């Protein structure tokens, strides 16, 4: 068990140690220094910064985390390809039976198999190969480019350049050939049109030949290799990550503290430098700028919506939360604009150049305005031409004239069919003839009825009673009997409300006197009477 060799501490000392570590992490206290005078990052966990017990380390240090084993003398050299060391003149015992070299056997020989080997001919003895042995480290064994000679790639470049020169030469020959054909073929309009087409072809070929005349946005300035390997791009279209990391801007140990766990540097690493020349001002500078505020507002909105019962969570469904927040912002802006428009429509806009009415400035006006029964202004403002309150030049339901073009018996109608019912279907001249026939028939019936009657009956004159009923004029009522009838009517109505008080052997008198009839008429509720609630 690798534990740190620390002495026993009391509860108070342990609390102070914890507070000191928290202050070091927050940057309020200076960092701990090891035995070599180097600062120890306070964010390193204790199980990594504490030395094992068997090292007997009394001072804080990180030497136990560093590599203490010395590496062997690894080399990055590679085999000398095709190198020869010694060439014998005659066959040697143990050499290759095919070529005569001592460095390999006949089974591993890479030369052409001879019809009669060098062992028997003792001629054309091959030289011995240079045998090398390297001690490679872990990375050297897996380096796929180890031993590669970059100078050999010039042959590939020369091959592509030769192909490009041949292509340009061929295009130039084609261009000269078309120019000769153009000079030899000058025949009228057809020749002119052909010449224009040839000029277009020449322009295209010229663009292919001369790459220096390409557009500025497609100009190839420099070829760079991307991190993925194999793909290339232009300097204009490809961003090269040559910017310096923020923890390397200031190598002073007392400068802004960098937290490797969260990759944050809250303070400005170069506080004395020109702000125009700096691209990084510290994390605190960007916490309240850019999209950081939008993200903060999004979190606050998701919390408030969740507290109000909305199924919205920023960590569980971030896309849904962002979509709901955007819809909320749109609805909020729409409501705000509607409120603004409503207020401006009601009170006006003081920023406009329109003259403010006197009614709004003084609260009153001396201008006299007169209206007609239809609510139209007839006097008091600018002169208004008389205009019909009905829609003009609108012919509905097959009519050929507008409503109000016909007048009869104090009623408006349609002139085309003489109908006085609005929105009725037009019957034309047939409807006019039918109406006239019905009118003639009605007049004939009235005349026939008057002729058959010998003497008209006298209409009995009636007068309205006080409560709206018709009674004969010669009717005489007894005032005392009328008062008794009114009392009796009130008593009967009270008994009707509660029939349980009616006696079993009650007797009714069905004879109605004129006074009782008048009392009934006086007590009866008239629903059409506007004063019935005050009786």
Swiss-Prot record:
Keywords, in A-Z order: Metal-binding, mRNA processing, mRNA splicing, Nucleus, Phosphoprotein, Spliceosome, Zinc, Zinc-finger
Any one biological process term the GO annotation gives: positive regulation of cell population proliferation
Domain of life: Eukaryota
Residue ranges annotated as motif Nuclear localization signal: 486-493
Keyword Nucleus included in the entry's annotation: yes
Chief place where the protein resides: nucleus
Tissue expression: Mainly expressed in tissues undergoing cell proliferation, particularly in lateral organs.
InterPro entries: Slu7_dom, Splicing_factor_SLU7
Zn-finger region bounds: CCHC-type: 96-109
Effect of inactivating the gene: Reduced organ size due to lower cell number and reduced fertility. Cell proliferation is arrested precociously in organ primordia. Altered expression of splicing factors required for the transcription of the cell proliferation gene STRUWWELPETER (SWP) and for the timing of cell cycle arrest in leaves. Double mutants smp1-1 smp2-1 are not viable at the gametophytic and/or embryo stage.
Known function: Participates in the second catalytic step of pre-mRNA splicing, when the free hydroxyl group of exon I attacks the 3'-splice site to generate spliced mRNA and the excised lariat intron. Together with SMP2, involved in the timing of cell cycle arrest during leaf development, in a STRUWWELPETER (SWP) dependent manner; promotes cell proliferation in developing organs.
UniProt record similarity statement: Belongs to the SLU7 family.
Protein name per its UniProtKB record: Pre-mRNA-splicing factor SLU7-A
Native organism: Arabidopsis thaliana (Mouse-ear cress)
Gene name, Swiss-Prot/TrEMBL: SMP1
């Amino acid at each position: 068990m690798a534990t740190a060799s620390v002495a026993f501490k009391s509860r108070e000392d342990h609390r102070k140690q914890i507070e000191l570590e928290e202050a070091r992490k927050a940057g309020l206290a200076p960092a701990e220094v090891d035995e070599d005078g180097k600062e120890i990052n306070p964010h390193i966990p204790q199980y990594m910064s504490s030395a094992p017990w068997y090292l007997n380390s009394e001072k804080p240090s990180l030497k136990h985390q560093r590599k203490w084993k010395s590496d062997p003398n690894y080399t990055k050299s590679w085999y000398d390809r095709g190198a020869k060391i010694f060439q014998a003149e005659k066959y040697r015992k143990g050499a290759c039976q095919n070529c005569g070299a001592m460095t390999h056997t006949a089974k591993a020989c890479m030369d052409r198999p001879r019809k009669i080997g060098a062992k028997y001919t003792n001629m054309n003895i091959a030289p011995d190969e240079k045998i090398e042995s390297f001690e490679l480290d872990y990375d050297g064994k897996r380096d796929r480019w180890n031993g590669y000679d970059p100078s050999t790639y010039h042959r590939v470049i020369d091959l592509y350049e030769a192909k490009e020169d041949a292509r340009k030469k061929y295009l130039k020959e084609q261009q000269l050939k078309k120019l000769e054909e153009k000079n030899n073929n000058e025949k009228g309009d057809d020749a002119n049109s052909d010449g224009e087409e040839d000029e277009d072809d020449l322009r295209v070929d010229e663009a292919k030949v001369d790459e220096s005349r390409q557009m500025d946005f497609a100009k190839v300035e420099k070829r760079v290799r991307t991190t993925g390997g194999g793909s290339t791009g232009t300097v204009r279209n490809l961003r090269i990550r040559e910017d310096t990391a923020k923890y390397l801007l200031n190598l002073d140990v007392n400068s802004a503290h960098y937290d490797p766990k969260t990759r944050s540097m809250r303070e400005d690493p170069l506080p004395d430098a020109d702000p125009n020349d700096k691209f990084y001002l510290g994390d605190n500078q960007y916490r309240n700028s850019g999209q950081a505020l939008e993200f903060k507002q999004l979190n606050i909105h998701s919390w408030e919506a969740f507290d109000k019962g909305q199924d919205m969570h920023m960590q569980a469904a971030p896309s849904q939360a962002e979509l709901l927040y955007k819809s909320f912002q749109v609805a909020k802006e729409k409501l705000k604009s509607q409120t603004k428009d409503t207020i401006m429509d009601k009170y006006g806009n003081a920023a406009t150049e329109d003259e403010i009415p006197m009614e709004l400035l003084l609260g009153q006006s001396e201008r006299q305005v007169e209206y007609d029964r239809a609510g139209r202004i007839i006097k008091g403002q600018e002169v208004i031409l008389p205009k019909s309150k009905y829609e003009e030049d609108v012919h509905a339901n097959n009519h050929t004239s507008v409503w109000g073009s016909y007048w009869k018996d104090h009623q408006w109608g349609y002139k085309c069919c003489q109908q006085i019912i609005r929105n009725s279907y037009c019957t034309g001249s047939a409807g006019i003839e039918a109406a006239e026939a019905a009118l003639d028939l009605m007049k004939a019936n009235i005349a026939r009825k008057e002729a058959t009657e010998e003497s008209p009956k006298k209409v009995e004159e009636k007068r309205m009673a006080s409560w709206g009923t018709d009674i004969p004029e010669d009717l005489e009522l007894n005032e005392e009997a009328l008062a008794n009838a009114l009392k009796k009517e009130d008593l009967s109505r009270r008994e009707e409300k509660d029939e349980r008080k009616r006696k079993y052997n009650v007797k009714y008198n069905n004879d109605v006197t004129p006074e009782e009839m008048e009392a009934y008429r006086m007590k009866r509720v008239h629903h059409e009477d506007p004063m019935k609630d005050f009786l």
